[in-house]
Design a protein with these regions (language model features):
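Active-site recognition of the HExxH zinc-binding catalytic motif
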Residues: 236-252, 274-278, 282
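C-terminal edge strands of extracellular/lumenal beta-sandwich accessory domains
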Residues: 429-438, 468-473, 499-510, 514, ...
Length: 571
């Protein structure tokens, strides 16, 4: 996307549209002031229309670094204010200088942050916007710089200078929102990796990033391929990924990731994580309509109004559905009223917690819970912190077919979705609790890994009930033996795998291959055993039939319903 000025070794290559003027001369002396405004083109994303270049607006570049250069050396540096203005005082008079804007937001002290936009196909070079050299003369000077979109009317015909600053503008809004809840926040450094060469292709070649995404070890990757998929003006997409960054930096996510669609019945960890990103995007942008543009000329778009009650169009509302959860999260935050069609009961959202309580729950209970991250510990934290709001919170959860949340484990839930394979009655015999409970020294029978919630769009691997959760409490610390053994009948040789979760401590994984003796006729030989050292407290065991977490087109696709007996013993 932006082939604007990538800064390598402090050399700026991106030229900006600049304007200059001189004011009345200062009192006799040897210095003048240089000031101005930094702006960029923002192309609006419109639901149903994509990017509408005819409605491009000029926006101030807020909080970005501005440098004053003399002979390519930086002689002064400052930051633009909330209106994009900057100012340098005591600049040598009658001197040739230039202005350069770095695509970064930096602040030291408390609060602090470091956000940068770099070109991931050009050595991680920082994008910059460079103005022409001018002479300071003997009077105060105004020098404005503008980053243009590069759109030529039917295609991009010039450097896409505005893109990095449009990206940073979303980060600015996100930071300001967080600061309303936690004014002294220290944000970990983050890089946005954007390039016109970033294509929506999964591969190993430069720019083949697949899709816009947050990766903890890298930062945020954003597509920029014109006529395919560009995200620099998709404010919700950028803010969604910032939501994942905040989740990683200040909260916790146990999400297993993978493909997902709004109507899918997902693993609850994935459902909450994606819902959080989308709801945060609506909060940070102040726009409840999430928009993602793509296609030839960027004229196509996907959009969803997170303010609406999803059960109007969503066939699968519940604690496992990202559309339900994104609406719930936004309704907890906002002051809007959801008005379904006249054929549906009126749901009035009279709760407006604002961002402070949302952030508090997100960064405390959601981070430290011994349960897995999902809607349950989040809502439980809100209910505990705000007992007077419990009835209104419960109204919102029940409107999404989520029973009143009474703990972090989803105790008392009655909605287990709509299976896509077997009947609901059949599935309910195997799956009727969010977590199963067991005692150390006992055997929990018939914990079933299912593929009954497979999606026609996104497959089976991360869907509801493919992975099952068992909670148990350790009172005598030390080495324990965990055994998961298949039981008849099985459709194929089973391969149970186990993940042990200990809150925000590192998880333990046991994924041994099935023994040669494991067969349909000998299911008890299909076993996974490991012996971790456990501390006192609550633990969660995640278990699954390995193939039920594979894609439908995998060489070893899901074998479907596979049940296990589970034991945890202390020698």
């Amino acid at each position: 996307m932006l082939r604007l000025c990538v800064c390598i070794s402090l050399i700026a290559l991106l030229a900006g549209c600049g304007g200059g003027s001189s004011s009345a001369a200062p009192a006799p002396g040897t210095t003048v002031a240089v000031s101005g405004q930094i702006t960029f083109d923002r192309v609006p994303a419109v639901a149903g229309q994509g990017l509408v270049y005819a409605q491009t607006v000029v926006q101030p570049a807020r909080g970005v670094t501005v440098e004053l250069l003399q002979s390519d050396s930086v002689i002064a540096s400052t930051t633009t204010d909330a209106t994009g203005n900057y100012s340098f005082g005591n600049v040598p008079a009658s001197t040739d200088v230039s202005i350069r804007v770095r695509a970064e937001m930096l602040r030291v002290g408390t609060p602090s942050w470091s956000f940068r936009v770099v070109d991931n196909v050009n050595g991680e070079a920082l994008y910059t916007l460079a103005g022409a050299v001018f002479n300071t003369g003997t009077a105060n000077v105004t020098r404005n710089l503008h980053a243009a979109s590069g759109w030529g009317g039917a295609a991009y015909t010039a450097t896409r200078s505005a893109a990095p600053f449009a990206i940073l503008d979303v980060a600015y809004d996100a930071v300001q929102l967080v600061l309303t809840a936690q004014p002294l926040t220290v944000f970990p450094a983050l890089r946005f990796h954007w390039s016109p060469a970033n294509v929506p292709v999964d591969g190993t070649a430069p720019g083949e990033i697949g899709s816009s995404q947050f990766k903890p070890s890298i930062g945020i990757l954003l597509v920029g391929a014109a006529d395919q998929d560009t995200d620099e003006y998709d404010r919700h997409v950028i803010a969604h990924e910032l939501g994942h960054y905040l989740e990683y930096a200040f909260s916790r996510s146990d999400s297993i990731g993978g493909p997902h669609a709004l109507s899918d019945q997902l693993d609850m960890r994935l459902a909450f994580g994606e819902a959080w990103g989308t709801a945060f995007a609506a909060m940070a942008t102040g726009d409840a309509v999430y928009k993602d543009t793509f296609g030839a000329g960027q004229r196509q778009s996907f959009s969803v109004d997170v303010e609406q009650r999803p059960s109007r169009t969503n066939p699968n509302p519940g604690w496992f559905n990202e559309e339900s959860l994104q609406s719930l999260l936004f309704d907890l935050y906002d002051h809007g009223r959801d008005v379904p069609p006249t054929t549906a009961p009126l749901i009035v959202d009279d709760l407006a917690l604002g961002f402070g309580p949302i952030w508090q729950a997100f960064t405390t209970e959601q981070r430290t819970t011994r349960a897995l991250t999902s809607v349950f510990p989040f809502v439980d934290a809100l209910r505990v912190a705000r007992p007077g709001d419990q009835p209104l919170i419960d109204n919102l959860t029940t409107s999404q077919r989520i029973a009143a949340v009474t703990d972090a484990y989803g105790t008392g839930q009655t909605n287990f979705g709509l299976p896509t394979k077997r009947t609901l009655l059949e599935v309910s015999q195997d799956f009727n609790t969010v977590y199963s409970s067991m005692a150390v020294g006992a055997t929990l029978q018939n914990v079933c890994s299912l593929d009954d919630y497979t999606s026609a769009l996104t497959g089976a691997e991360n869907k509801l009930a493919s992975r099952r959760f068992v909670r148990f409490t350790v009172t005598n610390p030390g080495q324990h033996t965990i055994t998961v053994r298949a039981r008849a009948p099985i459709n194929a040789p089973a391969d149970p795998d186990v993940v042990l979760h200990r809150g925000n401590e590192p998880r333990l994984v046991s994924e041994d291959a099935a023994a040669p003796s494991c067969a349909i006729s000998t299911p008890t030989a299909c076993v996974e055993t490991f012996s971790p050292t456990l501390s006192v407290g609550e633990h969660v065991l995640e278990l699954y039939e390995w193939t039920n977490t594979n894609a439908l087109d995998d060489a070893e696709p899901p074998i479907g319903r596979t049940c296990f007996d589970v034991t945890v013993t202390r020698p």
